[in-house]
Regions:
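N-terminal core-binding DNA-recognition domain of tyrosine recombinases/integrases
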Residues: 27-127
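Basic, Lys/Arg- and aromatic-enriched nucleic-acid-binding interface segment
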Residues: 136-164, 168
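Active-site/catalytic core of tyrosine-dependent DNA strand-transfer enzymes
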Residues: 203-271
Length: 303
């Protein structure tokens, strides 16, 4: 029987659970004295803020939610996408967080909007049960199309993510020193969400060498001087979203940049199994390489 992961309720260790419980007390107090908006909306928002609080307790060990920063929302969005939350759930939770932040005296207008956070409306059929992974041919089709329309950079970003399993923000943060490390050590050290540091193995240096040759010392690999990272992220996401018919094989499936991590996970897991590792051993390695350190996450990626 296939194991079912409850994406809305994950286990915490005792210390983190205590932090989360204290946050919930704070949240309930705020909503108990709040009369703004409809009751059902407040009820849904309270649930959304508690989901955010659980993430904040787990990833940042935050004792209160009075000082929400952009980095917290970027990490939270990545987490929700990793867990397979629908876009409607993500946007509602973000609205809940902004509502709550205003209630505790913060200014939600200073927080990044959904566009900056990379939240793009996708198909109504989006759900955790769908296999979000790209296929080999879809990746090649995308790279070819991107090159044909003068967006070779997008093709390189997609190929690199499929080879290394990097998040889009991690791809955009790469600089020449990362590439030098890859060429010398066959690995790249990545600082991911929540400050987690991991080593990602490099098995094919072809693209790495090309990017190294084309990147000036001290510069980012994919972000040109004067460019804003969040705009590059938004642009490639929209490019993928708007050109599905040019590279996707299944017209009823919505491919996203995040789906490249699913592609990496499935292929890397298969590769490790073929080298004699057990399923559990392979999952541990893949989970670590994806930057999760939580094996049950691979259930979502291997779907």
């Amino acid at each position: 029987m296939k194991k079912v992961i409850d994406k809305y309720d994950w286990e915490l260790d005792n210390k983190t659970q205590n932090i989360y419980d204290n946050l919930c007390v704070q949240i309930e107090k705020i909503f108990r004295h709040c009369n703004q908006g409809a009751y059902k909306t407040r009820e849904r928002y309270e649930a959304g803020v508690k989901n955010f609080a659980k993430f904040m307790a787990d990833a940042f060990k935050k004792q209160n939610l009075n000082n929400i920063k952009p980095k917290h929302l970027y990490a939270y969005v990545e987490f929700m996408q990793d867990m397979g939350y629908s876009t409607s759930y993500v946007t509602t939770n973000l609205s809940a967080v902004r509502f709550f932040y205003d209630q505790v005296g913060g200014d939600s207008s200073k927080l990044p909007n959904n566009n900056r956070l990379g939240v793009i409306s996708r198909s109504k059929e989006e759900r955790i049960g769908d296999n979000k992974a790209w296929r080999h041919l879809e990746i090649e089709n995308f790279i070819r199309y991107a090159s044909d329309v003068g967006q070779e950079r997008y093709g390189d970003m997609v190929r690199l993510s499929s080879q290394l399993g990097l998040r889009i923000h991690e791809v955009c943060r790469l600089n020449k020193s990362h590439l030098r490390q890859a060429l010398q050590e066959y690995k790249i050290t990545i600082k991911g969400k929540g400050g987690l540091v991991r080593d990602v193995p490099v098995r094919d240096k072809t693209l790495i060498q090309k990017l190294y040759n084309n990147t000036q010392r001290g510069e980012k690999v994919f972000i040109k001087q004067g460019e804003q990272t969040h705009r590059v992220i938004k642009n490639i996401q929209m490019f993928i979203y708007n050109n599905q018919d040019k590279f996707a094989l299944d017209k009823d499936k919505q491919l996203t940049f995040h789906g490249l991590r699913h592609f990496y996970c499935q292929n890397r897991h298969k590769e490790l199994m073929q080298h004699g590792l057990t399923d559990l051993q392979a999952r541990k390695i893949v989970s670590r390489e994806l930057g999760h350190y939580r094996i049950n996450i691979t259930e979502i990626y291997l779907n």
